[in-house]
Amino acid sequence: MENPVPIKKAVFPVAGMGTRFLPATKASPKEMLPIVDKPLIQYAVEEAVAAGCTELVFVTGRNKRSIEDHFDKAYELETELEQRHKTALLSHVRDILPSDVTCLYIRQAEALGLGHAVLCARAAVGNEPFAVILADDLIDAPQGAIAQMAEVYRQTGNSVLGVETVAPSQTGSYGIVEVSPWQQYQRIQSIVEKPKPEEAPSNLAVVGRYILTPRIFSLLQTVGRGAGGEIQLTDGIAKLLEHEPVLAHAFAGKRYDCGSKLGYLEATLAYGLKHPETAEAFRTLLQKYSQVEV
């Protein structure tokens, strides 16, 4: 096969209301919730950039201006830090995005689901393959999940979904795929959105990472409203299966479901224990609390 076009564009659907974290998300998006000293969306962006993406498309909603501000220049803050000789902090602020990376913000006028959010990015993505990253799913890995999946795409030219095995009782929270061996990969045979455990084709779940060919856009235009009355990306992918191979990639790394309170707290613990400024003292603090009856 000819060498496929490299993945240069990443789409971040960030228009959700974050109701699980109210009232914290009443005026601030859930993607700006911090894990130690960086917001979730920054971890997602860093993963995309590390995979070679240089064009970042944020599909936003109301109350999402802080995401745009976070990735914009902050002249007053930089001047203040420079005057106070806080060079380390100044470097952190200036280096949030490499100079060759550009950001585009598109408003999703109605909350019509993940498939609709991806469709909103069509004009920005054009006729190129692209990544979709859900910031709720924080993945800690030596090589980012999108970089791993981009390598599979480079070898095959096919769409790739990031997957992991979940407990059968959890299938109702995910898109679930059925796979079969294909060359040295796993080809998806079917995909269904949030099935009951007894109706799930497997317990292999799609978890917030996608590399998609541009054909997905025309297919998303044809799907009606699915689960929850929304335009589901899962339904578009189900149609994509009829036209081309779609692969499942069980990425190496630990995923934290930061869309749930418990997953968010677990991520905070894990990242706090390895952060150079907090690791030692935080470990001591946890040992202290572990001795207290709960």
Question: Which positions does each model-derived feature cover?
Answer:
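Short, conserved catalytic or adaptor-binding loops enriched in Gly and charged residues
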Residues: 91-102, 180-182, 239-241
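Conserved beta-strand scaffold positions in the cores of enzyme catalytic domains, especially
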Residues: 32, 103-105, 159, 246-248, ...
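Catalytic-core segments of class I nucleotidyltransferases/pyrophosphorylases
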Residues: 131, 150, 154, 181-284
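Conserved beta-loop-beta/alpha segment of the NTase-like Rossmann-fold superfamily
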Residues: 69, 77-80, 94-176, 212-214, ...
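Well-ordered alpha-helical segments embedded in enzymatic catalytic cores
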Residues: 40-43, 116-120, 236
